[in-house]
């Protein structure tokens, strides 16, 4: 698994001894991630690494933060392909999440619901996604709280999919729907179901990861897959939602 590690249970934007706006990561809050196929997620994004250690060893330090809220160190790298990765370290253990910065920006809101997951709202869509700078997001919950308003770049990485006849665009996040019913962030995960008609396909080479990936345009939403698909095909995919924010903009 690429997404592993520990966080300070009382780390905040004002220092690790404060308690407001805390980032927490007890075992039950990260269990959902370990159940997901994170190796498949990274390989589909073109990161051809054997494990976390190899990824961290190869990660450039062009964006290197020390003492980020909840973490001892944060590394961020934006690949020319549009793919990016955020690596976060606490007490010698690392976690990493990918993001895709090649899609179109859209106005939206996002808040942090768990250490790595943000709840994104843009247009008519509301879904949980892996966030590229979770430590910079305001803590919120399903019944209220602060949200960060700005430009977001959502994307979905397909873990499995089927192609067929053209379809209307839909995106559903069953875990987010449950979250707003039971108010339990421990059950939240970034897995989504998406369907639509492929409006365009572009091949990309991940220079850092040495792998290739394809981006399908589904009504403006980038759907990342590991092989070439045909324009005009309908697709139904189960995948993981990502969200790039303005935090890392130059």
Q: Can you annotate each of these PLM segments?
A:
Residues 195-197, 215-217, 238-240:
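Beta-strand secondary-structure signal
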Residues 117-125, 130, 199-223:
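OB-fold (S1/OB) nucleic-acid-binding surfaces
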Residues 184-191, 197-210, 248:
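Single-stranded nucleic-acid-binding OB-fold domains
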Residues 48-194:
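Long, hydrophobic alpha/beta structural blocks
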Residues 143-150, 224-240:
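Short nucleic-acid-contacting surface segments enriched for D/E, G, S/T with interspersed K/R
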Residues 242-250:
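Short, Lys/Arg- and Gly-enriched loop/turn segments at beta-strand edges
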Residues 3-4, 95, 127, 223:
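Short, isolated positions in well-ordered beta-strands
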Residues 1-55, 236:
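N-terminal alpha-helical "arm" segments
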